[in-house]
């Protein structure tokens, strides 16, 4: 049994928070991609990268209930983008397994909709920004009139 199946990604129903159920459904879908999914030369996202994405999101949203799941977007090169677009802001966190170590490479771009400020970073700086901003942009906003 793969680690994804052990996490409940195989399709088995578990008592999970809404955001985690949505995240794991997205992971399940991506785990089924085959070579050539995005045209000649495209490669599927490896299981280890999907597991890293789940780890990053779970770590950032730990203890939070009223949040939305990010969208996981595959790259044709086997990379993965974790993204949120919300009233509060945007994050596009790119991860791949092409680096020199087990962590691969990570980078982030984001925008705070309240201030209009944009931010970006790579490596450890990107991880720190992701941990800081993921809980902010993932929070469900009940007030649709929340100013930007």
Language-model features, listed with the residues they occupy:
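Eukaryotic low-complexity, non-globular regulatory regions
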Residues: 1-71, 77, 101-148
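Long, acidic/polar E/Q/S-rich protein-interaction regions used at subunit-assembly interfaces
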Residues: 88-90, 101
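A preference for well-ordered globular domain cores
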Residues: 86-88, 107
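Short, mixed charged/polar active-site loops
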Residues: 90-92, 118
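Short beta-strand micro-motifs enriched in acidic
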Residues: 73-77, 85, 94-98
């Amino acid at each position: 049994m793969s680690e994804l199946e052990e996490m409940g990604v195989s399709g088995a129903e578990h008592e999970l928070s809404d955001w985690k159920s949505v995240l794991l459904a997205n992971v399940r879908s991506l785990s089924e991609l085959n070579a050539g999914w995005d045209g000649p030369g495209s490669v599927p996202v490896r299981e280890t990268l999907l597991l890293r994405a789940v780890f990053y999101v779970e770590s950032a949203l730990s203890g939070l209930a009223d949040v939305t799941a990010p969208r996981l977007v595959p790259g044709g090169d086997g990379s993965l983008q974790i993204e949120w677009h919300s009233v509060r802001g945007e994050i596009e966190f790119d991860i791949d397994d092409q680096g020199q170590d087990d962590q691969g490479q990570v980078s982030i771009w984001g925008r705070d909709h309240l201030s209009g400020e944009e931010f970006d970073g790579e490596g450890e700086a990107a991880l720190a920004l992701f941990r800081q901003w993921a809980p902010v942009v993932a929070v469900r906003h009940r007030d649709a009139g929340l100013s930007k």
